Amino acid sequence: MTNEINHANPAALHSVPYHVGIIMDGNGRWAQARGRPRLAGHQAGVDNIRRILEASVRYGIKVLTIYAFSTENWQRPMDEVMGLMQLLSLTIKRQLNELHKNGVQIRHSGRMAGINPDLQAQIRHALEVTQHNDRIILNVAFNYGGRAEILDAVRQVIADGIPPDSLTEELFSRYLYTCDLPDADLIIRTGGEWRLSNFLIWQAAYAEYYTTPTYWPDFDEEELYKALLEYNARERRFGRVLQQT
Ligand code: FPP
């Protein structure tokens, strides 16, 4: 029984990552494997966010950043792009109250420009309503690109007239969309690829990386537990040498 996963016992984990980023890949393949349209996979993907959010609260994760729509995703077929926009809109309509009641603080990382003004208003409303919640932060990376984020930050640093000598990593971090959030500790990618795909490229500089072939809609609490176990087995050195005994 020693190898049995005991996901009912979060205490078995000696360290829990504070900030987890998830690249939710494999929705399309999940749908294709069932002979269903890609959007059915994205809908199943949305349903799974709820499940993993609840599990994250149980494990003590404090910030969950999910990659929901990248700046590159605009190049997908128009019906898929519109479908993803609609899904976010419907999800906010249907789930905001419940998320708020459960103490979830919603954040947005990404460019507002380019998003339909009605959806922008819905996003702003969700951020405002939940801003004082503190059970977990659900940071939705939507119309997000890591390079665009760095570029936007550089532009603002220049616009603010920050003298080059006083610009530190810490100050620069505050200009990113993630602003006061700490760096990511663990990046999980579902769907089997080994790529960061322009996700949290500044914030994940020292994150541990975990990938699984499981498609996002099938990534359940047990899969999350496996990722956390793997994280526990890693030795985080942040570029240093561990002290010799
Ligand atoms: C990748 O699957 C996933 C995405 C493009 C984004 C993930 C989106 C969701 C979970 C739904 C939208 C979320 C919100 C909050 C509205 P893929 O299509 O690349 O899958 P594939 O690699 O199998 O084709």
Predicted regions and their residues:
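Flexible, compositionally biased loop and terminal segments
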Residues: 1-245
